[in-house]
C-alpha cells in the first residue's frame, strides 16, 4: 500500500515550486485548499478585497485580524525605538560626563534586605550603564549586593525567593484582559441579517399589536426576536469558549522550562519563577529569560533583533559588553548570567505587557471555508431576492391566499396596516432564507475542531503553536526525522572504549590506564562540556547536560574525575562550542603550571582525521601510521554497525605566549585543530524507543514515508534505520537509499531533486543538508514534516510545511521556528499528530457534507413553494431553529469526532485535492434530493396524503409535519455524515459522548418546540401517528445512504471537469 502513496506527483500535474496544479489560475476555487504558511499579510488583504463578502464582521470572526496584526507590529516598532532612544541619551550623557569630568550620579540604594534597590538596578540594566556597574565593583560587586554566590547561585529556599520577589518583583507581566462574554455577544449581534430580523421583529410587533391587539398581536414579533436572541447567545457562548481555550494554549506556549543554579546545583524551573539574583547558564539557542549581566562566557553572541529590530549578532563579554536583554536569543557560544531585572522591569516585559497576544493564526482551511461561505452566501442572497420578488408580485396580484382561501390583498380594500404587516412578514421570510443559506457554521466548525484537537493533542504530548499545522499535518507525505531522542530513547551510556589503540575490557575501568593519561583525559572532559556535575545534600553525584554530555561525564566520573577540582585548578581560556556543521567542539585550558592544552571532542572519524599521534600505555606520543589509522576506522565502523554513537577525544599542547591577551582578539581567536593527539574513542549506546518500529510501519501504511536525517556516522544511522524499520533489509542500504550529507550536498539542484524521493537515511548530515532535502522534496510536490531540536535546525523547520521541534532537547530558537512542539521527543507522538491532522480534515468534510445538505434542501423547498404556491412551509422562527442546529449543535457534534485507525489506512490528502470530494457530492445529492422530493410532496399533497381534510387546522398540521420531518431528517443525516465512505455509520458512536448528547438535546428541544411552543414557532401539537410519519421519513435516509455508498464515483474530481473546460475555452479564445 505504501508504495502507491509514496510515488511522486506527476510532473505535468504539479508546479515545481509549490506542488500546485498546472491549472493554478483556474483552480482558485473556494472548494480547494492552498498552503498559507508564512503567507504575507498583503496577500491575505488582497484575498479579502477580491471577495464579495456578506456580513464581513461575522464571516471573518474566526480569521486573522489584519488591522490588529499591524497595530501589534507598530507597537513593537515604538518599543524598540523607545529602547534605542534611552540608550542614545545615556551614551550622550556619559560622553558629556567624560568631557566635563563630572560623574553621573547613581540612584540611591533601596535598602531593605539587599544592598541595592529595584530602581537603581533597573536603571543600570535598562540604560546599560557600564560606568555605574563598575562603580559597584563590576559583576562580582553587584552579586555581593544581591547576596548571590556566582558559582553556587542563590539559596533558593522559600523565604529567600519571597524576599527577592518582594524587593524586585516577579518574572511575570500583567496580561491584557481577554474579551468578555458581553463583547462576544456584541460582536455576534453585528450580523447584518440578524439586525434586519430584529428590525422586522419590532415592526411585526408594532403592527401586530395595532391590528390584532395586545393579546395576540405580539406573538410573531416576540417569537422572531427571541429566536434571534437565542442565535446570538449560542454564537457568543461558543466563540467565548474557544477564546478561553486558545488563551490557555498561549499561556502554555509562553511557559518555558529552563535550568538555574541554586544552592550549588542545577534545577529546572519555569521562566515565571526566575528571581533577581538567579545565576542562569546560557547555551546556543536559548532565550535570555530576563535582563541581566554576563558573569562569564566563551564566544557568547546574542541576537538582539527581537528588541532592536536590527538583524545583528552582538558579541558579549563580562567587562565591556556584559548586559543581556530578555527575549533575545543566544546565537553562539555559552556563558552564565546574573539576573538583574524581571517582569515589567525588563524591556521585554514592558513590550509584552503592551502587546496583547492573540491566536494570530489564519489557517488555509479557514481561508477556503470563508470563501465557501461567501460563495454560497451570494447564491443565497440571489435566491432570497428572487423569493422576495415573487412573493411581493403574487401578493399584489391577488395570488396570495388568506386563511379563508380568499386573496390576502384586494386593491383599495385592504388596510394599509395589514399591507405593511404582510410585507414585513414576506421580507422576514426572504431575510431568513439568507440566514439559512449562508453556511456560517463552516468557519465555526474549523475553530471547534482545531480547539478540540489542540486540547486533545496536549494529552498526546504535542503542543500546537500554529493552527495551520493541525490541518497541514493531515496532508503530510513524508517525515524527515532526527534519530537521537526521537527514534531512540536518548538514554546514553558509554559501553565501549579504545584508549589510544588499546580496547579496554571494561570501559569504566581506569586500573590499566596510566595516571598521566587519565589526568589529561579527564581534564579535557571536565572543561570541554556544556554539562555540569554537583553533589546533592545526601552526597549523591548528579550530572546535568545533554544526553551525550551526561554519558561522557558519568564515564569520566567512573575513571576518577573530580569535576570541581579540575575546574578550579585550571581555567578555560577560549571555548569553541560543539558545532553541528563541524561535528566537534573544543576548549583551550591553562593548567596551574601555565601550560596550555587544546582539547577537542566530537564525531570519531572527523576528530580522528585531525590526529597525527596517539598516546600509548607508556604515556608516549606515537605517530599515527596509515595502518593504525585504518585499524581505528575499522573499529569505529564496527561500533557504528552495532548502532553505537562514536565520539573521539583528542588534545594538543600549545604555546602560552601565542594566545592573544586582548579580550577582543581572544574572542576572535580560533582554536588550532591540527596535529592532534588521540586519547580515546568511546562507543555510546542509545537504544531504539519501544514501539517506534510499529509507528514507522503505520506511517508507511498511511502513505507517509519516514526518512532519518542524522548527524551520526552512516553505519550507526544504517543500524538504527534497520532496527526501526525505515530500511527493510541490508539490500536497501545502498545509495541513494542510504546517503551521506556531504554526497547529497555535492549534487546539483536537478540531481538532488531527482534522487531525493529515494532517500530513506541521510547520515553525517548538517542542518543545511536537511534544509536542502526539504527544499528538494517540496519541489517534487511533497508536503514535508521535519523534526528538529538544534538552533541550526531552525531554517529547515521554517522551510518545512510542518516544523516539529523537540520539547525536551529542543532549543528555544528551534521551538520558536516550529509549528508543533513534541513534548516528549517521541516519534510515536509525531504519528499521533498525523492522525489528529487527518481527523481535523475529515471532521470538517463531515460537517460540510451535513450542512450543505441542509442548505440545499431548505433553499429548494422554500424557493419552489414560494414560486408555485406563494407561501413558504418553513417560517422565519423555524428556519432560525434549523440554522441553530446546523451552525452550532451540528458543528459541535461532527467537529469533535475523535480520530480512528481507519484514517491511517488512507493516502494523504493532496495539496490541491478538492475539499468536497466526489463521495461527498454523491452523498449530499442523494440526501438533499430525497428531502426535497418528500417534503415538497407533503407541501402540495400533504393534506390528502396525511388524511387531514377533516381537521380544522389542516394547513398548520401539514406545515408542522414538514418542519418536524425536516429537522428529524437532519438528525438521522448527522449519523450518515459521521462516516461518509463507510457502510457502518454506528461504529464507535457510543464512544463519542458529545455526539450522543447533542443528538439527544436536539431531539428533546424539537419535541418541546413542536408540542409546547406552538405559538412561538408557528406549530401545532402532533399526535403519535404524525410523529411516526416524521420519524419514518427521517429513518429512510439510513438505507438510502447505504445504497448510495454502493454507487461508484469517478476518480476525477467534479470540479476538475469545469476547470478543464474553462481552460480549453480560454486557450481556444
Swiss-Prot record:
Mg(2+) binds at residues 789, 793. The lineage of its organism: Eukaryota, Viridiplantae, Streptophyta, Embryophyta, Tracheophyta. This is Calcium-transporting ATPase 10, plasma membrane-type. It comes from Arabidopsis thaliana. The active site is at residue 482. The N-terminus contains an autoinhibitory calmodulin-binding domain, which binds calmodulin in a calcium-dependent fashion. Residues 1-29 are annotated as: Disordered. GO terms for molecular function: ATP binding; ATP hydrolysis activity; calmodulin binding; metal ion binding; P-type calcium transporter activity. Belongs to the cation transport ATPase (P-type) (TC 3.A.3) family. Type IIB subfamily. Keywords: Acetylation, ATP-binding, Calcium, Calcium transport, Calmodulin-binding, Ion transport, Magnesium, Membrane, Metal-binding, Nucleotide-binding, Translocase, Transmembrane, Transmembrane helix, Transport. PROSITE patterns: ATPASE_E1_E2. CDD domains: P-type_ATPase_Ca_PMCA-like (cd02081). The keyword rRNA-binding does not apply. It is found in: Membrane. It comes from the Eukaryota. Its main location: membrane. It holds the Pfam family E1-E2_ATPase. Residues 2-180, 241-369, 445-844, 896-915, 974-991, 1046-1069 are cytoplasmic. The keyword Acetylation applies.
Amino acid at each position: 500500500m505504501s508504495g502507491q502513496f509514496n510515488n511522486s506527483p506527476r510532473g505535468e500535474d504539479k508546479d515545481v515550486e509549490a506542488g500546485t496544479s498546472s491549472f493554478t489560475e483556474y483552480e482558485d476555487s473556494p472548494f480547494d485548499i492552498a498552503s498559507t504558511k508564512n503567507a504575507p499579510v498583503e496577500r491575505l488583504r488582497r484575498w479579502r478585497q477580491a471577495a464579495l463578502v456578506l456580513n464581513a464582521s461575522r464571516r471573518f470572526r474566526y480569521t486573522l485580524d489584519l488591522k490588529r496584526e499591524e497595530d501589534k507590529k507598530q507597537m513593537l516598532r515604538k518599543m524598540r525605538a523607545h529602547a534605542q532612544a534611552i540608550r542614545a541619551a545615556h551614551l550622550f550623557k556619559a560622553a558629556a560626563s567624560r568631557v566635563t569630568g563630572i560623574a553621573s550620579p547613581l540612584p540611591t540604594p533601596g535598602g531593605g534586605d539587599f544592598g541595592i534597590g529595584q530602581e537603581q538596578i533597573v536603571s543600570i540594566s535598562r540604560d546599560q550603564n557600564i560606568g555605574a556597574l563598575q562603580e559597584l565593583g563590576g559583576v562580582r560587586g553587584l552579586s555581593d549586593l544581591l547576596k548571590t554566590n556566582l558559582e553556587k547561585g542563590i539559596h533558593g529556599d522559600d523565604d529567600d525567593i519571597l524576599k527577592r520577589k518582594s524587593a524586585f518583583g516577579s518574572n511575570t507581566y500583567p496580561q491584557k484582559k481577554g474579551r468578555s462574554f458581553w463583547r462576544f455577544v456584541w460582536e455576534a449581534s453585528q450580523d447584518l441579517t440578524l439586525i434586519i430580523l430584529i428590525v422586522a421583529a419590532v415592526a411585526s410587533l408594532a403592527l401586530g399589536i395595532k391590528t390584532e391587539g395586545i393579546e395576540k398581536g405580539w406573538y410573531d414579533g416576540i417569537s422572531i426576536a427571541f429566536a434571534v436572541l437565542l442565535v446570538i447567545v449560542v454564537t457568543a457562548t461558543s466563540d467565548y469558549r474557544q477564546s478561553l481555550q486558545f488563551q490557555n494554549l498561549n499561556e502554555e506556549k509562553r511557559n518555558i522550562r529552563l535550568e538555574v543554579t541554586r544552592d550549588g546545583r542545577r534545577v529546572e524551573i519555569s521562566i515565571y519563577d526566575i528571581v533577581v539574583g538567579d545565576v542562569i547558564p546560557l547555551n546556543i539557542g536559548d532565550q535570555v529569560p530576563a535582563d541581566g549581566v554576563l558573569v562569564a562566557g566563551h564566544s557568547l553572541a546574542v541576537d538582539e533583533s527581537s528588541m532592536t529590530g536590527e538583524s545583528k549578532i552582538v558579541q558579549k563579554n563580562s567587562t565591556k559588553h556584559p548586559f543581556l536583554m530578555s527575549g533575545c536569543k543566544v546565537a553562539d557560544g555559552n556563558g552564565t548570567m546574573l539576573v538583574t531585572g524581571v517582569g515589567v522591569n525588563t524591556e521585554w516585559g514592558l513590550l509584552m505587557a503592551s502587546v496583547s497576544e492573540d491566536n494570530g493564526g489564519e489557517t488555509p482551511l479557514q481561508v477556503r471555508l470563508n470563501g465557501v461561505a461567501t460563495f454560497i452566501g451570494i447564491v443565497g442572497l440571489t435566491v432570497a431576492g428572487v423569493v422576495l420578488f415573487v412573493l411581493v408580485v403574487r401578493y399584489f396580484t391577488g395570488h396570495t391566499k388568506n386563511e379563508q382561501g380568499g386573496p390576502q390583498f384586494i386593491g383599495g380594500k385592504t388596510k394599509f396596516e395589514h399591507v405593511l404587516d404582510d410585507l414585513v412578514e414576506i421580507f422576514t421570510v426572504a431575510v431568513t432564507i439568507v440566514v439559512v443559506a449562508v453556511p456560517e457554521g463552516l468557519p465555526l466548525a474549523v475553530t471547534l475542531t482545531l480547539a478540540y484537537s489542540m486540547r486533545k493533542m496536549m494529552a498526546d504530548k504535542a503542543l500546537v503553536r500554529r493552527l495551520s499545522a493541525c490541518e497541514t499535518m493531515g496532508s503530510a507525505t513524508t517525515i524527515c526525522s532526527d534519530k537521537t531522542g526521537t527514534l531512540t530513547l536518548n538514554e546514553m551510556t558509554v559501553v565501549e572504549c579504545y584508549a589510544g589503540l588499546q580496547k579496554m575490557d571494561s570501559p569504566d575501568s581506569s586500573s590499566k590506564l596510566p595516571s598521566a593519561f587519565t589526568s589529561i583525559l579527564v581534564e579535557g572532559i571536565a572543561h570541554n562540556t556544556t554539562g555540569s556535575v554537583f553533589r546533592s545534600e545526601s552526597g549523591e553525584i548528579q550530572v546535568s547536560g545533554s544526553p551525550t554530555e551526561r554519558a561522557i561525564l558519568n564515564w569520566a566520573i567512573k575513571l576518577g574525575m573530580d569535576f570541581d577540582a579540575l575546574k578550579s585548578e585550571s581555567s578555560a581560556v577560549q571555548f569553541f562550542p560543539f558545532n553541528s556543521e563541524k561535528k566537534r567542539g573544543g576548549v583551550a585550558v591553562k593548567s596551574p603550571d601555565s601550560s596550555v592544552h587544546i582539547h577537542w571532542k566530537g564525531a570519531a572519524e572527523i576528530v580522528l582525521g585531525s590526529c597525527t599521534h596517539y598516546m600509548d600505555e607508556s604515556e608516549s606520543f606515537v605517530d599515527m601510521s596509515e595502518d593504525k589509522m585504518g585499524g581505528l576506522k575499522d573499529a569505529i565502523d564496527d561500533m557504528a554497525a552495532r548502532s553505537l554513537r562514536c565520539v573521539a577525544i583528542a588534545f594538543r599542547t600549545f604555546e602560552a605566549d601565542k594566545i592573544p591577551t586582548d579580550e577582543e582578539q581572544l574572542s576572535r581567536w580560533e582554536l588550532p585543530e591540527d596535529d592532534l593527539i588521540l586519547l580515546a574513542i568511546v562507543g555510546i549506546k542509545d537504544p531504539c524507543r519501544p514501539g517506534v518500529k510499529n509507528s514507522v510501519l503505520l506511517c508507511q501504511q498511511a502513505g507517509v514515508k519516514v526518512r532519518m536525517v542524522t548527524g551520526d556516522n552512516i553505519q550507526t544511522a544504517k543500524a538504527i534505520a534497520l532496527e526501526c524499520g525505515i530500511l527493510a533489509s541490508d539490500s536497501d542500504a545502498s545509495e541513494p537509499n542510504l546517503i551521506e550529507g556531504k554526497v547529497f550536498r555535492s549534487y546539483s539542484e536537478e540531481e538532488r531533486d531527482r534522487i531525493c524521493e529515494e532517500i530513506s537515511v541521510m547520515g553525517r548530515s548538517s542542518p543545511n543538508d536537511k534544509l536542502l532535502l526539504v527544499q528538494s522534496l517540496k519541489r517534487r510536490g511533497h508536503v514535508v514534516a521535519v523534526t528538529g531540536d538544534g538552533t541550526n535546525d531552525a531554517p529547515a523547520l521554517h522551510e518545512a510545511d510542518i516544523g516539529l521541534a523537540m520539547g525536551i532537547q529542543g532549543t528555544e530558537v528551534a521551538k520558536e521556528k516550529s509549528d508543533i512542539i513534541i513534548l516528549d521527543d517521541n516519534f510515536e507522538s509525531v504519528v499521533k499528530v498525523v492522525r489528529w491532522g487527518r481527523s481535523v480534515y475529515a471532521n470538517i468534510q463531515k460537517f460540510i457534507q451535513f450542512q450543505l445538505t441542509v442548505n440545499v434542501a431548505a433553499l429548494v423547498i422554500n424557493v419552489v413553494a414560494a414560486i408555485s404556491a406563494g407561501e413558504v412551509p418553513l417560517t422565519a422562527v423555524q428556519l432560525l431553529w434549523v440554522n441553530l442546529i446546523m451552525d452550532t449543535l451540528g458543528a459541535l457534534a461532527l467537529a469533535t469526532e475523535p480520530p480512528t485507525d481507519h484514517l491511517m489506512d488512507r493516502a494523504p490528502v493532496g495539496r490541491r485535492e478538492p475539499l468536497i470530494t466526489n463521495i461527498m457530492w454523491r452523498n449530499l445529492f442523494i440526501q438533499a434530493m430525497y428531502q426535497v422530493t418528500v417534503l415538497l410532496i407533503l407541501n402540495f399533497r400533504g393534506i390528502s396524503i396525511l388524511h387531514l381534510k377533516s381537521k380544522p387546522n389542516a394547513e398548520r398540521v401539514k406545515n408542522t409535519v414538514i418542519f418536524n420531518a425536516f429537522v428529524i431528517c437532519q438528525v438521522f443525516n448527522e449519523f450518515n455524515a459521521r462516516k461518509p465512505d463507510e457502510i457502518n455509520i454506528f461504529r464507535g458512536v457510543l464512544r463519542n459522548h458529545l455526539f450522543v448528547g447533542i443528538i439527544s438535546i436536539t431531539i428533546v428541544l424539537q419535541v418541546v418546540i413542536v408540542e409546547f411552543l406552538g405559538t412561538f414557532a408557528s406549530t401545532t401539537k402532533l399526535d403519535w401517528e404524525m410523529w411516526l410519519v416524521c420519524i419514518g421519513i427521517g429513518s429512510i435516509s439510513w438505507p438510502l445512504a447505504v445504497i448510495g455508498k454502493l454507487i461508484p464515483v469517478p476518480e476525477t474530481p467534479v470540479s476538475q471537469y469545469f476547470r478543464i473546460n474553462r481552460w480549453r475555452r480560454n486557450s481556444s479564445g
